């Protein structure tokens, strides 16, 4: 074979080898990229801590649906690119490995830090036990309300004097004129279209009418479940002496006992005892507390509490506000400011108005004024065990247009229960 033919054959062989190497490299890179994308697509997704659930206390928690906000884009026009100013100046001294002095290794033992004491949290008392206590504590209401009405309608055929007496009974029980008229109208209609001969018949009819008046289909869940990027925010408002701070503590106890991380905001900066009381609750139930100095700006404390909740990855932030009379315009404006400032950091999910069930008619004026200043989403009716006028529940819902979500039944840590219209009416009529 001639020398030229050998050279041509060798060149051809080299070209074939090079082509094979290039082709193999391309296939390898494509397969590697494919595997990377496959692993990314099959990786675990971020865990979602939300989702409606009913706590062991019987209180139902839910999540507020918020509109999706587009993520803010960072303007990179003025930022240095990767690698800018990263080169070492040419005149910098050069060091070899032998020039670098390494420190002698020392075994440093850090002192053992004491573990933070985890507060012991007692199990939540089942709601059934609290509802049994409610029935017992409403004995005075039963005598003044349920028995009186049942005695009037057992016969089925009421004259005008009986209807007037029935109306007076409803008004005395604090149902108010609007709810009273609604109940009277429903009773007239039911009596015309049904036969009521026994107390059992009367009880069944009255029970249906009263439950319907309480609008059982209203959403009574507490919107205290976290969002994807920030905790739920609850604002607790009301006048002095209604039990706001105690309600905040009891609600925190329920949330922590069910595995939620809770931050409390002591925005009542006018009364030092309020922050101290909330500190006691926080220590007792295992919540975190954000408080300011006495006389600090309440809106600033509320903002810091929400900021702390976001930074700490909390599930819910509950803000206790100062008690204020509805007649104090300046304090009511301050309440509006608190909500506006907090909203800059995160949306407010719930504004719960705490009302004293024993105040009767005066509470309705409070309801109207607070509803004008902040959008009330629900009511918490405290001291329900101490009133003989259970009809206030009907009137509050009528005046406020939002549901009674929780009721306070006493001073105990578990004396906070979900409001259930059917259970409440049964307690009135037993």
From Swiss-Prot:
<dbReference type="InterPro" id="IPR003593">
    <property type="entry name" value="AAA+_ATPase"/>
</dbReference>
<dbReference type="InterPro" id="IPR036225">
    <property type="entry name" value="SRP/SRP_N"/>
</dbReference>
<dbReference type="InterPro" id="IPR042101">
    <property type="entry name" value="SRP54_N_sf"/>
</dbReference>
<dbReference type="GO" id="GO:0016887">
    <property type="term" value="F:ATP hydrolysis activity"/>
</dbReference>
<dbReference type="GO" id="GO:0005886">
    <property type="term" value="C:plasma membrane"/>
</dbReference>
<dbReference type="GO" id="GO:0006614">
    <property type="term" value="P:SRP-dependent cotranslational protein targeting to membrane"/>
</dbReference>
<comment type="similarity">
    <text>Belongs to the GTP-binding SRP family. FtsY subfamily.</text>
</comment>
<keyword id="KW-0547">Nucleotide-binding</keyword>
<dbReference type="Pfam" id="PF00448">
    <property type="entry name" value="SRP54"/>
</dbReference>
<dbReference type="GO" id="GO:0005525">
    <property type="term" value="F:GTP binding"/>
</dbReference>
<feature type="binding site">
    <location>
        <begin position="238"/>
        <end position="245"/>
    </location>
    <ligand>
        <name>GTP</name>
    </ligand>
</feature>
<dbReference type="GO" id="GO:0003924">
    <property type="term" value="F:GTPase activity"/>
</dbReference>
<dbReference type="InterPro" id="IPR027417">
    <property type="entry name" value="P-loop_NTPase"/>
</dbReference>
<keyword id="KW-0378">Hydrolase</keyword>
<keyword id="KW-0675">Receptor</keyword>
<comment type="function">
    <text>Involved in targeting and insertion of nascent membrane proteins into the cytoplasmic membrane. Acts as a receptor for the complex formed by the signal recognition particle (SRP) and the ribosome-nascent chain (RNC).</text>
</comment>
<feature type="region of interest" description="Disordered">
    <location>
        <begin position="75"/>
        <end position="95"/>
    </location>
</feature>
<keyword id="KW-0342">GTP-binding</keyword>
<dbReference type="InterPro" id="IPR004390">
    <property type="entry name" value="SR_rcpt_FtsY"/>
</dbReference>
<feature type="binding site">
    <location>
        <begin position="382"/>
        <end position="385"/>
    </location>
    <ligand>
        <name>GTP</name>
    </ligand>
</feature>
<keyword id="KW-1003">Cell membrane</keyword>
<dbReference type="Pfam" id="PF02881">
    <property type="entry name" value="SRP54_N"/>
</dbReference>
<dbReference type="InterPro" id="IPR013822">
    <property type="entry name" value="Signal_recog_particl_SRP54_hlx"/>
</dbReference>
<keyword id="KW-0963">Cytoplasm</keyword>
<dbReference type="GO" id="GO:0005737">
    <property type="term" value="C:cytoplasm"/>
</dbReference>
<protein>
    <recommendedName>
        <fullName>Signal recognition particle receptor FtsY</fullName>
        <ecNumber>3.6.5.4</ecNumber>
    </recommendedName>
</protein>
<feature type="binding site">
    <location>
        <begin position="320"/>
        <end position="324"/>
    </location>
    <ligand>
        <name>GTP</name>
    </ligand>
</feature>
<keyword id="KW-0472">Membrane</keyword>
<dbReference type="GO" id="GO:0005047">
    <property type="term" value="F:signal recognition particle binding"/>
</dbReference>
<comment type="subunit">
    <text>Part of the signal recognition particle protein translocation system, which is composed of SRP and FtsY.</text>
</comment>
<dbReference type="InterPro" id="IPR000897">
    <property type="entry name" value="SRP54_GTPase_dom"/>
</dbReference>
